[in-house]
Amino acid sequence: MFSPEELKRILQESDVIKNVSIIKEAKLFENVYQTVLQGELVINERESFVVYIAVPEKWYRDLVDIYVADYNELVYMPHIDNKGKLCLFETEGILIDQNLPGIMMQSLLRAQTILKQGFSGENKNDFINEFELYWAQLKDCRIAHLAVETDRKNRIVKGGIKKSSKRKKEKQIEYIKRCKKAPIYIGENVESLKRWNLEKTPVMNIAYFVIYSEKYIFPPDIRKKLSIDYLNALLHFVPDGELASIMPRSRQDRIIVFEIHQPSGQTHFVGMYIKGGMLKETSLEKVEELQPLLMERADKKFLMKRVTEQDSENYKKRILIIGCGSIGGHVICELAKAGYEDLTIVDYEKLTEENIFRHVLGMEYVNRYKCEALNTYIQKNIPEVKITTLAERIEDAITEEDINFEDYNLIISAAGNHNLNRWINSWIQNNKIKVPVVYLWNEVYGIGNHAAYIKYGTSYCMRGQIITESAGGCGKTYVPYGNLVSLKTMLLCLKMVKNIFEENLDDNLLISLKGDSDYLEKHNLETSGRYLRQQEQIKILTGKQFVNINCGVCNDCNGK
């Protein structure tokens, strides 16, 4: 622990800063610090600027803050926020050396570099890399959630504002301030607004303009209010005819969104809430109020960047999932989260209390058909997923032609019922359906997880595979296993689906995970010889490796 006097002495010994003193009140812009020092940061032989070196209590986690004292007197430059604090280092994923004097000196050297480059203009293009970061610091900036198709044309999109009622004892001026901060929701159409539950919110037309500029468009100075000149400079990029047809000329409140394409290929999204104003040619005049909107993108293309690099065309593949139980429920939810947007789910059973602890759904959905409950859950939580539900047996759905296997790019059987899987397999083979099938199942008490990928022309056949089955007694029967077991099987499935659509699988594939047998043995049950013989935790068989040559079905399917 260093005292303020010790820190002052250490800084005074440096040639980076001079005239160091201790600030008695260790508080800057409502932030309380352990120690605040003041000094003149040396930029070159002729110039130095007064800065504050603020040491937080948790400096070992948050590093040191450095503020420029007379920030408003400086030229507008990157890496300084609207309070004059310099953005020094990105701490995400960095292991910080627990050496406070060293951290202070490194921070001062970084601050020196930022100011030098700022005065010379060397780092001006950093504004482009962090455009939205500066836009968010504009005075009275308001959040707007944006879910539209990008890189298209100038057009009208739809939006809504969730307004709340005035609270008891709330002053009118406070209520107005709160309303001005209410989030705005913007979608491609009325249907896309449903993700935010805006059914009772009035829908408004919003002007959406796509701008391509040959020169860089920089963010406005965050120390000043957003100006009408900045707005009109952006409007000048819009062709006259389109501007007049998309944005009304009348004096009324309006919202404008700009999709700005920079010469470097970067794209920025900004918006403005405009009170009053008349459109005259390509400019707005007599605007009463201009409020910047920070666009929080919620379109699928943007959201999926964080989770995958898969070809977006694969998301459009049609997938049929049979069984919405413990395995199927997890598989369906994770397929939706993985970006697949066209799912058909089939299950004739309702969710019961006894399955709550191994199903993705909770008590809220008990006594509802599993497929319909899953659809409700996903539509509430995951955007842009089309789900078709069928609360009936798959055999009936196929024979009555409610669905057709050939309409899908992939079939997943997660029912865990081997007799049903044989029926699916038989129908596929007899009708020469060229759609691949993935079969998923768990073993009793979690001793195993299996995923099998079967291409057209070959067969899934439990008679040809030596796999231990479990049978319950009369009444309510079930195969005992926990939620974690189904999660493991789901992970096998997701990886397999990705490989199928990326055409990484040339042949049939069977993956078996060997689980722990302790729980099974506690119930006085014995493992099979196959379980004992398998030494690997993960066993992978391909092609005809898992075909039993003594099975007529497998031999017939493989031309034996």
What does each of the following model-derived ranges do?
Residues 25-91, 101-102:
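Compact alpha/beta protein-protein interaction domains typified by the UBC
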Residues 126, 136-276, 406-410, 414-560:
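Glycine-rich phosphate/adenylate-binding loop
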Residues 334, 400-401, 422-427:
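A short acidic, amphipathic alpha-helical/loop segment
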Residues 309-350:
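Glycine-rich adenosine-cofactor-binding loop
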